[in-house]
Amino acid sequence: MLKKDSDAVKEALDQLSEVGWANKWSSQPYVSRRMTSLRELTTLGIKNAENLAIPSVRNDAAFLFTVVGTTGFLGVLAGQLPGDWGFFVPYLIGSISLVVLAVGSISPGLLQAAIGGFSSLFPDYQDRIARHEAAHFLVAYLLGLPILGYSLDIGKEHVNLIDKKLEKLIYSGQLDAKELDRLAVVAMAGLAAEGLQYDKVVGQSADLFTLQRLINRSKPQLSKEQQQNLTRWAVLFAGSLLKNNKVIHESLMSAMSKKATVLECIEAIEKAA
């Protein structure tokens, strides 16, 4: 179980399932994609379902507002300094906002890292991250995708679960409908988890990017309407799994928040089942 090899992890979990220990591993049978409406998402309990695919600007706006507001306030105070200091210091402080915008244009990654760090100040930050990543972990486990690692660290939030066979299919652009459906459900699990708990989803951008990458690597190619339906269906399926396994999801959230190992997280899933 400690091997960083997806085939070895999968084989070990299959054996544990056979002897009755890993009962939740790969326990969710395949369900083929179907037409799904926004009303079904709302009925499930997803809040503001019509806005799920719209990237949130909450963290970005709050960060930029804080930078501009703080520098503006400090600039006014600095203007009270005597002599030339009252001119040069406000000028230097005022330039901070321009520097931030310039960094965002030249190196967006640095700005996003700063915004990510700032986001941790929100009261719901830790719960959102744990809820989001635990959803990816749990849904992948239920669908039989081996988890090799995860992180809740700022700027590094992820669950590493793609196995070698699927990686080859993705890189070669040969994902079939069945595998695309399965991966789509895992990709949308974090978004679904947030949508079930909060009025607005914040961490959907990376999930939607992942889903689009998978769609682009699949055959046959999907039309825009089919892509939209796949997204809705995947959110519905993932949300249903999370609602039906709410206690397990919360137990996994707790374990991941304590930086438990992958094996300890799996134990948390099975004990809560």
Predicted regions, residues:
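Soluble catalytic regions of large protease machineries
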Residues: M1-V68, F73-A273
